[in-house]
């Protein structure tokens, strides 16, 4: 077995099953669900399973590196922790835990506009290396405040969410009684 794989966490389906047992139902539905009939969620899952990595045999493997440069900064891997709203609902201190792990492993961490940790706290944990995802609020003054706080905290990368003009219909959340304020 590879020494890079933690046998306690062998794969994503295993982690999902563990999370379903451990996280309250309404929070798991939020984390695991998608909008409308979950068509895009299903499509994304199917398409990622169709990705095939091409192996290169009989080559020197001593200097293998996944390092990459994104926006002028070198990271240990070409992926990071994407923004998840209401992380603290899923697990206490989740935003802080994930930000710390991302910082220690030198991968990007993106704080959601509706994250449960403050911009300032995440900037402190990541020494300003976090990214901030802006989900444009209805009120311009709120947007301006978020952007000001982000800049003052030393966060230099902004991810602007421009996929939908409003929150999607999430039937799992409706069934579980979860309601998110506007």
Q: Which residues fall in each region the model found?
A:
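An N-cap/entry alpha-helix motif that binds or orients negatively charged groups
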Residues: 1-72, 170, 177-182
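Alpha/beta enzyme core
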Residues: 86, 100, 121, 125, ...
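Metal-dependent C-N hydrolase catalytic cores
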Residues: 67, 74-87
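Hydrophobic faces of well-ordered beta-strands that scaffold small-molecule active sites
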Residues: 79-82, 109-111, 130-134, 158
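Active-site mouth loops of central-metabolism enzymes
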Residues: 83-92, 132-140
């Amino acid at each position: 077995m590879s020494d890079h794989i933690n046998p306690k966490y062998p794969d994503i389906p295993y982690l999902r099953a563990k999370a379903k047992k451990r996280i309250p139902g309404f929070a798991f539905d939020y984390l695991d669900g998608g909008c409308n009939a979950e068509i895009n969620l299903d499509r994304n899952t199917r398409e990622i399973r169709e990705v095939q990595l091409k192996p290169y045999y009989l080559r020197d493997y001593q200097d293998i590196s996944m390092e990459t440069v994104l926006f002028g900064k070198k990271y240990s891997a070409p992926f990071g922790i994407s923004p998840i709203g209401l992380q603290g609902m899923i697990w206490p201190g989740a935003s802080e835990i994930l930000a710390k792990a991302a910082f220690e492993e030198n991968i990007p961490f993106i704080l959601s506009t509706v994250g449960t940790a403050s911009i300032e706290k995440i900037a402190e944990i990541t020494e300003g290396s976090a990214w901030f995802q802006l989900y444009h609020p209805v009120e311009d003054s709120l947007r301006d405040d978020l952007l000001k706080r982000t800049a003052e905290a030393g966060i230099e990368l902004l991810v602007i969410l421009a996929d939908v003009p409003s929150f999607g219909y999430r039937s799992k959340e409706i069934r579980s009684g979860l309601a998110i304020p506007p």
